[in-house]
Regions:
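Short, basic, helix/turn surface patches
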Residues: 1, 50-61, 76-77, 128-132
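Conserved Motif II region of HX4D acyltransferases
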Residues: 1-8
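Glycine-rich beta-to-alpha transition loops that act as phosphate-gripper elements at the mouths
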Residues: 3, 27-30, 79
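A general structural-boundary detector
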Residues: 4, 23, 36, 69-72, ...
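Class I SAM-dependent methyltransferase SAM-binding "motif I" and its flanking Rossmann-like core
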Residues: 8-69
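A contiguous loop/helix-start segment that scaffolds small-molecule binding in enzyme catalytic cores
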Residues: 71-72, 76-168
Length: 168
């Protein structure tokens, strides 16, 4: 289900058709991330669609990249990995970053839960989700990014290290 080419290898079929000179016609189709984005209540004028995160290799660096995005970003996730992924996102993006988890978009048991990454991580640690999952995460705010970089080597500090703002 869904739109071919969105988080699946459908683009390879379209590319091969183009290579062979065949016409590719597209129609609007269902994609879970658009209604999840709109119902999240997070800014949706600009956004980044990630799809599924890498399961192992490259996952940490991808999460770091996503954490720095200044726009709302969207991932698809397996119900079995959801709690772990939310905990990782809370660690990398910060516990207080707003987010939402939507499941079973356009189906009988459609639900959307909104909160902070920390709240959502704790909720889904206890209550395992089922179905197709879309996670929508707020982009970083400028102050948050400055604080992360300022305290990169002192993550427990609220203020810059002594002398770090000395100008020569």
């Amino acid at each position: 289900a869904g739109t071919p080419g969105i988080s699946d290898p459908g683009f390879m079929l379209a590319r091969e058709c183009r290579r062979r000179g065949l016409k590719v016609e597209t129609l609007p189709g269902a994609t879970a991330f658009v209604p999840a984005l709109v119902s999240s209540g997070l800014p949706c004028d600009r956004f980044f669609f990630e799809g599924f995160l890498p399961p192992k290799k490259g996952r940490a660096s991808r999460l770091e990249f996503l954490a720095e995005l200044p726009v709302t970003f969207i991932i698809y996730e397996s119900p079995l990995r959801l709690a772990r992924t939310l905990a990782q996102l809370a660690e990398v993006c910060g516990e207080n970053r707003p987010a939402s988890v939507s499941r079973e978009i356009s189906k009988l048991h459609e639900t959307t839960v909104r909160g902070t990454l920390g709240e959502l991580a704790r909720q889904f640690e206890v209550n395992q989700a089922r179905g197709e999952i879309v996670v929508v995460i707020s982009g970083r705010v400028r102050e948050e990014a400055e604080r992360r970089h300022r305290n990169k080597y002192r993550p427990d500090a609220d203020e810059p290290a002594p002398g770090s703002n000395v100008q020569l």
